[in-house]
Amino acid sequence: MEQFDDARPRLEKQYEQVQYDPASGLSPEALRQEFDAECARHPGEPRILTRARLMRLICEKARIAPEKDNFFASKVDGGGLFLQLRRQWGQEMWKKEFDFQPDGWCSMTDLKEHACHYCVDTSHTCPDWEALLTLGFPGLKRRAEQGGDTPFHRAAAMVCEGAAILCERLGRASDNPALEALAHRPPQTLHEAFQIALLYHDLQEMEGEEVRTMGWFDRLYLNFYRNDIAAGRLTRESAKELIKYFWIAFYAKWQGKRFGKNFCFGPEINELSMLALETYYELNTVDPKLSLLLTPETPQAFLELVARNIRDGRTAIVSLNYPLVVEGLIRHGRTPEDARRCIPVGCYEPAVFGREISCSGATHFFLPQAVALFLEEKGEYATFEELKQACFHRIAREIAYMEEQQRRCESIWPEINPAPLLSSTLADCIRKGRDITEGGAEYNSTACVVSYLPEAVDSLAAIEYLVYQEKLCTLDELRAALAADWKGFETLQLFARNRAPKWGNNDPAADRLAVELTRFVAPLINEAPNRRGGRFFASLYGQMVVERGRLIGALPDGRNAGTPVAKNLDACISMDRNGITALMESVVKLDLANFPCGTCLDLMLHPSAVQGDDGITAIAALIRTFLAEGGSGLQFNIFDVETLRDAQRHPENYRNLQVRVCGWNVRFTDLPPEAQQTFIDQAGAIAG
């Protein structure tokens, strides 16, 4: 096989330049005709069987792409039929349940009136990779057949049978013995294990559920690696080549312009952990991204290798506090044994591996918008304490509304996107005879991302300071300033921005409000039932800061309408005035185990602060200190403001400049100017 460095330009474009063999199967048009005929032969059957028939039809008869110059083959031309079917059913069910058609899958219409967002979340899933690697497609088919004869069991067996047939077809077309073997048995080598994982990934995403974690890399593949080394099939260097061929496929699919493909490492660190982090450094790409489950016992050598990646611009890495993650999961209903088998799904949202469907992007609650809605009520309050309690009451009311709307979403999920392939990997689904959309997993959670805490805290702190402490304005005057987007109230805005307490500075007044607000909100979410026999599941971070900021009006903290909001648990943009230690001190005052679906802090460092070996040691020490003090998740950006400004002016010179955007990385030059400016402003603030 061609050396990776020579093949890389071609491999990076492999999903853009797919060459399907016309003679290998049916065109999308012919496939559609055959599917329509198949549906006509089975009128009125459960929709999960309809989707299973479509998967098997595609696997058996769709065109495929021979890939003789790649270690891995997985490309089959499904013709967009799954997406068409999901849209058809989605439009029907949304109209039936809600009497409106949403923009895509999600309803954003309630953000302004109810400070929330809800959706049918098919984008945050984790299959049981252990079952796939242990049983293979034939074994999963047998397990489904032995589990029962319900429509669900038949559908699960059908899709696994189709996947095995596709292995045979792709293997023959690509001269790939690994694929041909996988048609009949589970993987036995590292090459075969990577191959079945990639093919499964592509099939599940075609089915309609985004794979948001590829599992524990250094646990799932360790024995395959060790056996190949012992048998002489691989050397350390040839294993690196194989990993690069595998990982670059995930970059190639979206070109680094989506949310990143997550591979997890830890908490136990081994020789494959070290090899993979070395390979990641050499690969130097925005995707895949790495999630690290760290403990006080994490070896220093591993942590310094992580720090070297971060210091040198490979920042698509989040460090997670494994003991705290486990504590949060146990506190909120998982058994200790299950909690210890956690996996970050998506950005940094823990779930129980192989037993939980967490839907970690299902709902969002926008705290500062709720504060703004409360102010619009035009109530009068003699004390700040009275105002705060009334504001909390409005927040509770809107959270209850959001939860009820989400339960309605989940009631139609089985009729929109039943998931026989994903469900076939989960033993609990097979045991119960139920798809994931109907509560087939052991833990059926619905996450709520509690977003933009910094703006909410700073807004409440500003109200207390401006109205009740310094008496610089009345509530009605503050409302008038917000309605005018601070025009004509510029002096008051300066007091709000520069004198009122700010989150992220270890300020007791602001941090007290953050503790009170999070302590109030968490049980409203974590104790609420969902529609699938589980509960809601709180996380605490903020993403899409430019896009969501456009939808949020002026706020009491001095923020203008439509401007970007804070990422994750960071201070509001340019408001972290006391350095990173103060920022971390603010964060660790919160009881983050009450947000078991994940939280994260972003740190931006100037390159001069992390130069040389001492810089690597400093980053490693920051990670250890933050996690030891009770932080949950930590990630970094390291650059100076002049580099970013020059990249804006001369993007052709900075094609490999990565930035960490909430829970994933992108190339800086791929960001729109407004998003670029948020990084420039933050970098300018730390430069002084």
Predicted ranges, named:
Residues 162-165, 169:
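Extended, non-transmembrane alpha-helical coiled-coils
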Residues 1-156, 166, 178-185, 189-688:
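Conserved catalytic cores of very large enzyme subunits
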